[in-house]
Structure formats: C-alpha cells, structure tokens
C-alpha cells in the first residue's frame, strides 16, 4: 500500500475558487494539494466578469497584469453588458453601460472581462509557481474528519490508482453541487437560480 501523502491543505476542486485558494496559500508559504476531477482547465468560456476586488487579490499574488493582458486580447476593457432577445434580435436592456464606470474612484484595480477558459490556465501556472501540487483527473472518493484534520481517499479517474491524503485542513471548492458540503450537512439557502445565461 502506498504511503499516506501529507499536506497542510487539501483543496477539493481545481476551478477558479480552488486555484485561487492554492495561489493564496502558496503566496503565504502554505503548501497545498488540489484535486480536480476534470482532466484539465476549463475548455468553455463560462464565467467572464472579474470584479475589482478579485483583481486586487490577483495583484497581491502577482497575476493582475497578465490577466489584464489576456483580457484585452478578447474584450474591450470598458465594455458593456447588455441583454438581447436573440443574437440578431432586439436589444432589451443595458445592465452595465461601462464596466468600470465609478470603479476607478474606489480602487486602483479595474473590473475586467476574461473567459474562464483563458483565466484558469493563468491561475494554474501561478499556483504551481507558488508550490501547489495539482492533480487533474483525480477525485476525492471519501474523507473522515477528526480533531487534528482530515484523512481523504483520492482516485485517478483513468488509472484507478488510489492514495490516502492526510491534511490539517480541507477546502471545499467543488462547486455549486459540492459533494463535500453535502457530506458535511451544510445546506444552501435562498431562491435558487434567478436566470440562465450563456457567455459567447
């Protein structure tokens, strides 16, 4: 049986929240392991608007400028968000006429548009530079919590190889339908989805 892998923090989920967590931990000298069931970073645009507070955090960990550069390859920096009936149809409303209107009075960082498929690789690279161990195509299949931390079983989706991970802390970054949160009995409250949208 392979030896137990010991790491201060196990991050379950390697999308925007998981990668950002790993970057911040690494920035402050804390090692982490990220397990993500997908085989790589996002391949679809998905989320696109990054707030100025997030950009302030990205500045702290050294990725603000590269995120801005990558964003400017795709989007107008002070662009708008609008609603339409169809791609060629009637304009319904402008939700935001200028993404950064008033923002420069509040922060030295700006909001940006950048598709998730472009952002995740940037966060992945920085997390690795700061010492995170990233395991894609890997899922957490179970965990037990005690007074000193957690013991988790992880499995590679392709090979079927399993390993035991012992961590002082675990971050549940596995999305809106989090299995970790469900296992811990943490419920989501609220009205649920307000709308559906597609980033193009």
Where are these regions (language model features)?
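N-terminal Rossmann-like FAD-binding beta1-loop-alpha1 element of flavoenzymes
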Residues: 4-34
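Core beta-strand elements of the Rossmann-like FAD/NAD(P) dinucleotide-binding domain
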Residues: 5-7, 159-169
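Conserved phosphate-binding and hydrolysis motifs of nucleotide-dependent enzymes
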Residues: 13-18, 168, 174-175
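Active-site-adjacent segment of FAD-dependent monooxygenases/related oxidoreductases
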Residues: 43-47, 51-128, 144
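Central beta-strand plus flanking loop segment that forms part of the substrate or channel wall
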Residues: 65, 116-118, 184-200
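A conserved short coil-to-beta-strand element within the FAD-binding core of flavoproteins
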Residues: 136-151
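Flavin (primarily FAD) binding-site architecture
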Residues: 172-186
């Amino acid at each position: 049986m392979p030896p137990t892998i010991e790491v201060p923090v196990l991050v379950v989920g390697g999308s925007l929240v998981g990668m950002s967590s790993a970057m911040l931990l690494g920035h402050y000298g804390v090692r982490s392991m990220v397990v993500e069931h997908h085989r790589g970073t996002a391949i679809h645009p998905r989320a696109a608007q990054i707030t100025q507070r997030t950009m302030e955090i990205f500045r702290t960990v050294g990725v603000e400028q590269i995120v801005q550069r990558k964003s400017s390859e795709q989007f107008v920096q002070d662009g708008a968000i609008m609603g339409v009936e169809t791609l060629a149809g009637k304009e319904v409303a402008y939700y935001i006429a200028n993404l950064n209107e008033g923002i420069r009075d509040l922060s030295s960082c700006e909001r940006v548009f950048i598709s998730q498929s472009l952002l995740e690789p940037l966060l992945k690279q920085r997390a690795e530079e700061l010492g995170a161990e990233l395991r894609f195509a890997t899922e957490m299949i179970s965990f037990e919590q005690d007074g000193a931390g957690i013991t988790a079983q992880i499995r590679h989706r392709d090979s079927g190889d399993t390993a035991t991970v012992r961590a002082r802390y675990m971050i549940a970054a596995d999305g809106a339908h989090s299995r970790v949160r469900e296992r811990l009995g943490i419920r989501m409250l609220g009205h649920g989805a307000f709308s559906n949208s597609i980033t193009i």
